[in-house]
Amino acid sequence: MSLQRRTTLTKYLIEQQRENNNLPADLRLLIEVVARACKAISYHVSKGALGDALGTAGSENVQGEVQKKLDILSNEILLEANEWGGNLAGMASEEMEQFFPIPANYPKGEYLLVFDPLDGSSNIDVNVSIGTIFSVLRCPDGQQPTEQSFLQKGTQQVAAGYAVYGPQTVLVLTTGNGVNCFTLDRELGSWVLTQSDMRIPVETREYAINASNQRHWYEPVQQYIGELNAGKDGPRQADFNMRWIASMVADVHRILNRGGIFMYPADKRDPSKPGKLRLMYEANPMSFIVEQAGGAATNGEKRILDIQPKSLHERVAVFLGSKNEVDRVTRYHLEKKS
């Protein structure tokens, strides 16, 4: 009986290292460690109430958001998995106010890892897809990073990815050479390549936005959504469907597969905040992935990957997905500004 040939994450990364000479061995090892940590997080997520990890932890993170037990556990899993491998100079997380330097008793490497350990955690208790988002940067200051070391434009990312913990657990990854999706084989414990060179359809009839905030949106977003909702009788002469999961990884994963636009705009409630999503560990890695898949990502005025971060937990408006739609809503913002 012949065995079905399957490409695992390890095999894929080694082949990339051999063929392109643009994937250093220590970056390959770092990605594999992050992937193993995502497997561990997936296990704890799948236990649900049986694992005593549901509910809140009685604390808040630096964003002022109530932490779930799984938020804290996922953060600890990623820290512990990556601190001793010798590939990193430091890490930063949504759940920590300051960056995490590699302890002195461990070897250090040339990379920085930035992550949202459990995106969409408000959905944990109701069993809706959640995930992990991560970004890898080179440390410009050798092995002794400061917070400034992390504040690099998204164009400087050397790898980015996300895991979705849903009906299947999948890992979507880019190292700057296209986007690939791996599905976790729970029986064998390995990530198996299931989608190669993913591409976002240019034309789309779906969009994702939290419509409950409509009364707070600025005029360019009101105009754009108004056109979509007008359907065949409106200026777009087509019917559009809205989908909103309230989990960025789930919404973006759907768009990556089916096309569409994901929007989390700034609004009038707090003009001092340019948006809700964090630039370093949400918008940047997702924008890198989307652009590698042929899509686009802006903050309404400029390409997200060109934004110079000013702080570790900086927020930004996000419009990403199928290029034609992102270009249109960005044009509305620029026309209003001018």
From Swiss-Prot:
CDD domains: FBPase. Its EC number is 3.1.3.11. It is an enzyme of class 3 (hydrolase). Its main location: cytoplasm. One of its GO terms (cellular component) is cytosol. Pfam families: FBPase, FBPase_C. Binds 2 magnesium ions per subunit. It comes from the Bacteria. It catalyses: beta-D-fructose 1,6-bisphosphate + H2O = beta-D-fructose 6-phosphate + phosphate. Its cofactor is Mg(2+). The keyword Hydrolase applies. One of its GO terms (molecular function) is magnesium ion binding. Mg(2+) 1 binds at residues 94, 116, 118. Homotetramer. Belongs to the FBPase class 1 family. This is Fructose-1,6-bisphosphatase class 1 1. It comes from Paraburkholderia phymatum (strain DSM 17167 / CIP 108236 / LMG 21445 / STM815) (Burkholderia phymatum). The gene is fbp1.
